[in-house]
Amino acid sequence: MSNQMNTMDITEILKYLPHRYPFLLIDRVLDYTPGESLHAIKNVTINEPFFQGHFPVQPVMPGVLILEAMAQATGLLAFKTMSDDVPPPGVLYYFAGIDNARFRRVVEPGDQIHFDVKMIKERRGIGVFYGEAKVDGEVVCSAEIMCARREINQ
């Protein structure tokens, strides 16, 4: 049994996710097991564009962006589950639904968010996942996320 970790740096992440600045919200994948789980990080800095308006006096990362980052992590897990190869052009995983989202504390500049997502089930291109976002080991957000595999015309 191997203890080798499967990682993804930003160069590899860019091959899987269509998101680009300012909406690419995953910096690195620390480990993943196709069909099971993925652990990714987001380094939150004061340079994030959303901090200009949310909120200038007391900067707080918007909860919807924490959920978006979690959805991007589920997309990476879905792609790695489908195949270890880079996806063909025009194949995407769309954020299709969310249930039981809960926010437990704020995320501020200087925090590093750890995303742990687990695949619950997949059927006919629809994946259901459970995810948690943590800062310093404390859960800041949790949710059940659905994503759908789609081919788009280019």
Curated annotation (Swiss-Prot):
Its EC number is 4.2.1.59. The keyword Lipid metabolism applies. It catalyses: a (3R)-hydroxyacyl-[ACP] = a (2E)-enoyl-[ACP] + H2O. Its main location: cytoplasm. It holds the Pfam family FabA. NCBIfam families: fabZ, PRK00006.1. Involved in unsaturated fatty acids biosynthesis. Catalyzes the dehydration of short chain beta-hydroxyacyl-ACPs and long chain saturated and unsaturated beta-hydroxyacyl-ACPs. This is 3-hydroxyacyl-[acyl-carrier-protein] dehydratase FabZ. The lineage of its organism: Bacteria, Pseudomonadati, Pseudomonadota, Gammaproteobacteria, Alteromonadales.
